[in-house]
């Protein structure tokens, strides 16, 4: 009897064990019967909350789906602004499953890769619409917050809504905005040309101002030199006049001494060079101070 009882107990235990399903915290379970989604009386997909549940062995199965917030980190995508300028925008999306039944059916059985692909398309379509209505300046510095908020609202409602996928978008964020290499090079060349033009203009203005300053300095120098020469001429004239007056006064007071001094200077100048030749009579008046005084 015991020989037959043990297998029966083992089978019953196995059946009971295989009938128990544990849905852990942070997940939800969807009941599948013969791989078909089970629905309740209201035709809604049966979703199991975290806890202990039962199923029919070999007939029912549970598909466990993650109920936590997930992050879709997309690659940089090219978008066109209202100015017809290309931008490379790198963004990410925070999302979670809001309708587990719809998510399961719309993603081919809860395929997260397919869900990410579908969500990425919707996000890019929304960003394309938002960026296409703004300028580069608005996107880079002005209304980036409005852009992200607009994308989030559009993905939560309207034709771009992710509700049809059973997904709720929690947040949309733009990580980085860059220009394509060819556009960056073009803008760099244009900025360099503009800076070169400004530099040339500044240099031209500087040269013009330097020439003006130089001309003004030259004019002032010429005026100062002219005034100095005028003053020097006046002083020289005054000095010559004073010297002439002194000579005249001295001559008037001591005419003989004055004549003697002038003769000595004449001798000095005449005999300074040994090569000088003078043809004069010995009794010439030039030598009167070199002759013996008359008795």
Swiss-Prot record:
Give me the segments passing through the membrane. Answer: 4-24
Q: Does the keyword Transmembrane apply?
A: yes
Q: Which cysteines are joined by disulfide bonds?
A: none
What keywords are annotated for this sequence in UniProt? Membrane, Transmembrane, Transmembrane helix
A Gene Ontology term for the protein's cellular component: membrane
Main location per the UniProt record: membrane
**Superkingdom of source:** Bacteria
Q: Where in the cell is it found?
A: Membrane
Topology class, membrane: Single-pass membrane protein
User: Per its database record, what is this protein's job?
Assistant: HflC and HflK could regulate a protease.
Family of this protein: Belongs to the band 7/mec-2 family. HflC subfamily.
Q: How does it assemble?
A: HflC and HflK may interact to form a multimeric complex.
According to UniProt, the name of this protein is Protein HflC
Q: Species name for this entry?
A: Haemophilus influenzae (strain ATCC 51907 / DSM 11121 / KW20 / Rd)
């Amino acid at each position: 009897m015991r020989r037959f009882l043990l297998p029966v107990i083992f089978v019953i235990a196995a059946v009971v064990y295989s009938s128990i399903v544990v849905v852990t915290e942070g997940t939800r379970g969807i009941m599948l019967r013969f791989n078909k989604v089970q629905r309740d009386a209201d035709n809604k997909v049966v979703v199991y909350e975290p806890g202990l549940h039962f199923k029919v062995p070999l007939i029912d199965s549970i598909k466990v789906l993650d109920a936590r917030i997930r992050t879709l980190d997309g690659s940089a995508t090219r978008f066109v602004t209202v100015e017809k300028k290309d931008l490379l925008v790198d963004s990410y999306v925070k999302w979670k499953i809001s309708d587990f039944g719809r998510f399961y059916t719309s993603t081919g059985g809860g395929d997260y890769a397919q869900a990410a692909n579908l969500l990425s398309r919707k996000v890019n379509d929304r960003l394309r619409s938002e960026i296409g209505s703004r300028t580069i300046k608005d996107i880079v510095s002005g209304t980036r917050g409005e852009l992200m908020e607009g994308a989030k609202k559009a993905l939560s409602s309207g034709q771009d809504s992710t509700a049809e996928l059973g997904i709720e978008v929690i947040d949309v964020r733009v990580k980085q905005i860059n220009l394509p290499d060819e556009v960056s090079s073009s803008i760099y060349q244009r900025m360099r040309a503009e800076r070169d033009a400004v530099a040339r203009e500044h240099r031209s203005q500087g040269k013009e101002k330097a020439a003006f300053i130089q001309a003004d300095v030259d004019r002032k120098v010429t005026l100062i030199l002219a005034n100095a020469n005028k003053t020097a001429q006046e002083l020289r004239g005054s000095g010559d006049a004073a010297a002439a007056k002194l000579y005249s006064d001295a001559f008037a007071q001591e005419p003989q001494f004055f004549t003697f001094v002038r003769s000595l200077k004449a001798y000095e100048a005449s005999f300074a060079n040994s090569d000088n030749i003078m043809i004069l009579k010995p009794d010439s008046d030039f030598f009167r101070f070199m002759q013996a005084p008359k008795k």
